[in-house]
Amino acid sequence: MAELDRKELADLVRRLSVVQGCVTLSSGKQADHYVDLRRATLHHRASALIGRLMRELTKDWNYTVVGGLTLGADPVAIAIIHSPGRPIDAFVVRKYAKTHGLQRLIEGSEVSGQRVLVVEDTSTTGASALTAVRAVQDAGGDVVGVATVVDRGTGAAEAIKAEGLLYRSVLGLADLGLG
């Protein structure tokens, strides 16, 4: 990984996304800080860094499509597909299938028969990533691994690896001065 880019991203995430105070995470766990990574993934400079760093992090994984559970994964996937390198397409996993139109759970690029990278913005327990993994597998996709921008160090890596999947992250809480 380009260390200067990684340090710059950590600085941006710390400045834009770290919120101090007691919060309830999506897992139901309590924390004394929150990493609202959408503030970084939707920032012009941070998004470009995320795209480059995620491509670098997963360069040895052979995948053609990237995405994950909406909403956190969406800007991460878009950053990756717009980062320089080989062509990669994106998809979005809805939390629930639509009840009208095509009633799809997965929108965007087709995942059936494809090698797929599942992404997240921030990982806590890995539940969101694993929800996306199951949806992709049910749709006929081959998940090559899971990558996240920030790993909170609270069980996501272990849960994802327990499912037999590769797992990597760009940053940990220590990189943000929180660990």
UniProtKB/Swiss-Prot annotation:
Any GO MF annotation of the entry: orotate phosphoribosyltransferase activity
Record pathway: Pyrimidine metabolism; UMP biosynthesis via de novo pathway; UMP from orotate: step 1/2
Names of required cofactors: Mg(2+)
Catalytic activity, reaction form: orotidine 5'-phosphate + diphosphate = orotate + 5-phospho-alpha-D-ribose 1-diphosphate
Keywords: Glycosyltransferase, Magnesium, Pyrimidine biosynthesis, Transferase
EC number(s) from the headed UniProt entry: 2.4.2.10
Protein's recorded name: Orotate phosphoribosyltransferase
Source species: Mycobacterium leprae (strain TN)
